[in-house]
Amino acid sequence: MNGIINLRKEAGMTSHDAVFKLRKILKTKKIGHGGTLDPDVVGVLPIAVGKATRLVEFMQEEGKVYEGEITLGCSTTTEDASGDILDRTPVTELLEEALIDEAMESMTGEIRQIPPMYSAVKVNGRKLYEYARAGQEVERPERQVTIYSFKRTSPISYEDEQARFRFRVKCSKGTYVRTLSVDLGAKLGFASHMSQLTRTFSAGMSLDDALTLDEIAERVAVDDFSFLQPLELGIGDLVRVELSDEQVEDVRNGRFISLMSEEAELAGFYKEKLIAILEKREEAYKPRKVFL
């Protein structure tokens, strides 16, 4: 069994939980996912099955789109709604929407983030959330991410000295939207947190077409595996190149092939089928991952 699944992960489960349950449903162990979602986050979780697991690194490279809600007026230990309240800065006056929009626009492009303590980023061999649960604070390494767009998508609502509004963000892999929400609040002079989040697009797949675990199980029960999408969907942003019969044989035998390209990596195709991921070595390309 080989292919890619557009899974709608529900709230309350980790990405690992989703993979574990899919292994039982599909009765196969070779399953991985293309980008972790926090337990409270709903949305697209790209799933790789069989040979497609070798494409996970390329699936993760593609940009992602999220829709969610930011709350100004209080911050939490986890930067989202699941944490304990850390600080309060009451919102006592109406806010200027133009100022919020301007602040959001100023956070686009290449930016640097410090990952939250409650995250799976490793420092000295341990995940940050392990330090956080033990009450330990450690220095967290900055990372560079790209925010392609960051827009407010609703009017501002006010309740209990807090302000809320919805947003849409398109960003690179490795972006912590929780941290983006907190940093926006800081720009506006408020403690803040991300109060809701949904991933609507990832690895070329949309939430509109995603299936839940229950829906997948129902289809498997009647031997309907049409939800398995082809490996070709998993090449991410790699440039495609069509191979000749002779080049396919060279790839099959692990030989270098000559191609007119300067790309570090290419996706080699033959008759619309993915044959190999090719890696540039000086003046030729070496088969790095072969799918024949």
Swiss-Prot record:
The keyword tRNA processing applies. It comes from the Bacteria. The active site is at D38. One of its GO terms (biological process) is tRNA pseudouridine synthesis. One of its GO terms (molecular function) is tRNA pseudouridine(55) synthase activity. Belongs to the pseudouridine synthase TruB family. Type 1 subfamily. Responsible for synthesis of pseudouridine from uracil-55 in the psi GC loop of transfer RNAs. This is tRNA pseudouridine synthase B. It comes from Streptococcus sanguinis (strain SK36).
